[in-house]
């Protein structure tokens, strides 16, 4: 169906531009963007994510380094590593793979990263810049940035007159997503687990972004005809049709039910996921340009 938004295809276009801009930086200024990824412990899902991020960085022509450290690592040791990377001129982006072990304070770690190198966009300074609509100067969290690019592809950059509903209020997706939609002149509602009549709220949306981590919660009768649906949820459910103990990935939206009704919809997998990694590359490239006081590439 031609209303399915192909995240892989859009991400590939972005990566092609990142490669071209990286080549310009290297040829014109002798600068190679550098990213450091830190993973604490050996969680299999985290290992997969980190490997894919590192491979994509190398594909873009970045200097990429992985720090894989024991789950017994103490917080002060991790803080020391971050301080070292903060002062390393070869590194323009620092990413700590979440979740962290329970004995490490996640907030303390994310705030220890220099805001100029905070390519996840989690530092309070970057959050504040986004809230203040200083988008040119902020590092924007990767998933909302990628989702917003998909929305712009469908609706253009000015969302005046459109009602947007964001289901989920996390600092990683929900809140920054709402800020980006507001900056684009949409009328925005943030809904969450405590929202009364959530189905009615969702039905009001011209643009519906879901980030709640509830498999296939959003049903066909929750969505208006012709809505744009961006499904950020990644949920693993049993797939007995594949065999005993097998699973499959689904979003927060019942995709098969809703795809005929939506004007455009992202699949899971293959929707927002590839865009998240592409925007991490964009953030690293922009951070390198900004740290060297060079013009910031446009995407």
Curated annotation (Swiss-Prot):
Coiled coil: none annotated. It holds the Pfam family THF_DHG_CYH. Its EC number is 1.5.1.5, 3.5.4.9. Pathway: One-carbon metabolism; tetrahydrofolate interconversion. GO terms for cellular component: cytosol. NADP(+) binds at residues 168-170, 193, 234. Signal peptide: none annotated. Belongs to the tetrahydrofolate dehydrogenase/cyclohydrolase family. This is Bifunctional protein FolD.
């Amino acid at each position: 169906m031609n209303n399915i938004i192909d995240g892989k295809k859009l991400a590939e276009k972005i990566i092609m531009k990142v490669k071209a801009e990286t080549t310009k930086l290297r040829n014109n200024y002798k600068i190679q963007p550098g990213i450091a990824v830190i993973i604490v412990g050996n969680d299999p899902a985290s290992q997969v994510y980190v490997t894919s991020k590192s491979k994509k960085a190398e594909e873009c022509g970045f200097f990429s380094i992985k720090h894989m450290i024991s789950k017994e690592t103490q917080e002060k040791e991790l803080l020391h590593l971050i301080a070292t990377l903060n002062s390393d001129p070869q590194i323009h982006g620092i990413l700590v793979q979440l979740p962290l072990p329970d004995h490490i304070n996640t907030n303390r770690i994310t705030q220890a990263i220099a805001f100029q190198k905070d390519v996840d966009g989690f530092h309070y300074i970057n959050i504040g810049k986004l809230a203040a609509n200083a988008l040119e100067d902020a590092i924007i969290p990767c998933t909302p940035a990628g989702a917003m690019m998909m929305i712009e592809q469908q609706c253009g950059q000015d969302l005046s007159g459109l009602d947007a509903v964001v289901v989920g209020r996390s600092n990683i997706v929900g809140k920054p997503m709402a800020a980006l939609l507001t900056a684009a002149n949409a009328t925005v509602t943030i809904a969450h687990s405590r929202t009364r009549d959530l189905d009615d709220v969702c039905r009001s949306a011209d643009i519906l972004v879901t980030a709640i981590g509830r498999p296939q919660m959003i049903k066909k009768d929750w969505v208006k005809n012709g809505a744009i649906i961006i499904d950020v949820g990644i949920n693993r459910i049993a797939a007995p049709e594949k065999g005993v103990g097998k699973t499959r990935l689904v979003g927060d939206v019942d995709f098969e039910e809703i795809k005929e009704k939506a004007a455009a919809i992202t699949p899971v997998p293959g929707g927002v996921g590839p865009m998240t990694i592409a925007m991490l590359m964009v953030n690293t490239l922009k951070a390198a340009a900004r740290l060297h006081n060079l013009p910031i590439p446009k995407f």
